[in-house]
Amino acid sequence: MKVLVINCGSSSLKYQLLDMETEKVLCKGLCERIGGEGSCITHQVGGNKMKADAPFPSHTEAFAKLVEMMTEGEGKVIDSINEIDAIGHRCVHGGEKFQKSCLVTDEVIKTIDELSPLAPLHNPACLLGLKASREVFGMDKPNVVVFDTAFHSTMPPKAYMYPLPYEYYQEYGVRRYGFLGTSHKYVSLKAAEYMGQHPKDLKIITCHLGNGSSIAAVKRGQVVDTSMGMTPLAGLMMGTRCGDIDPSVVNYLKYSLGITGHELDEILNKKSGLAGVSGVPSGDKRDIEAAASAGDKRAQLAQDMLNYQIKKYIGSYAVAMGGVDCLVFTGGIGEHDAQLREAVCEGLDFLGIRINVDKNQNCHGDVCDITGWRGDVCVLVIATDEELMIARETKQVVEE
């Protein structure tokens, strides 16, 4: 079976074609600036990368172009569109309606649209991809939608409810949903596989740390709590997002600064977090680390705050699960920032978390075990693969 994995933005389309017999990536690429000037496609087969300018008035033309790149010329990996057995789409928000991946129908599209107020930037983009895919591939080709929120749907009410008037949950769906679930699921399963144990026998804390960051408590294969909330703004401080703050700060700033709700939303989402504290506009952890090394005290403070917050979540989730067997670091920062991993794990001996400093500094491969001597908790650095997880889910849904 060959599965095409799609991740749509409002003006972009990221894709990957996988042969599920071997789980090998046949090709991958990115269509950019859809609906605007200078639209183009970058198509990669192995180490060979091709770029072509092409007009993409909509996602439909982008789909048609990626099919052309796959079936013709230098980037050809299949003979025809018929070799693609199914298309798997990433969707950020499934709300309470979608607790697992499902086949796309008119009713599913309608429901995803109804959930758009919960993810106004992401769900409409997913819908553009779903509709364009059906246009290009035809209505008979199976399309499967995989939700970022689905893996977190096992959280109990005591973890997902907010202490607000209950009718706000009933009428408006105000509750914790959690995000980046596809990554959390992939690395938790990978960790269990590495440890040679069934997921149902383990208590795992997964730390997906990147420009967007999320931590999850996975007990016996099910999420019991996670750091992100009703939106991906909650939880840890991130590259440019504030994470958890006192809710009263929002109104205080709105009136003190004399700004609109939209302007405040921009500050909380795009000018806060590591960027806001450090003064490094990019919010990129590498830039902040460099600034801290050069003696920038605000950059150092931003790093200290992030490390401290991650520690707190690890401690609280260990308590929530009654212990921890495995701690996983993943995501752009989690996989590549040895300094952060060491700082986070320092002082967690009482939980049985100890790392080998040399292994931590020389971390390579899909799974890197950095557990230290006499460490009771397996500490792993795992390269996440959300596309592969979406492809697996798609294959499973189609075969069912």
Model-derived regions: residue spans:
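Short glycine-rich, Thr/Ser-proximal phosphate-binding strand/loop in the N-terminal lobe
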Residues: 3, 12-57, 229
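Structural signal for terminal/edge beta-strands and the immediately following C-terminal loop/tail
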Residues: 366-400
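General beta-strand structural signal in soluble alpha/beta enzymes
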Residues: 89, 121-124, 142-147, 205-207, ...
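Short beta-strand-loop/turn "lid" adjacent to the catalytic site in phosphate-handling enzymes
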Residues: 70, 76-122, 142-144, 150-159
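Glycine-rich phosphate-binding loop of actin/hexokinase-like ATP-binding domains
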Residues: 151-255
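Phosphate/ATP-binding catalytic cores across multiple sugar-kinase/actin-like superfamilies
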Residues: 187-190, 194, 301-322
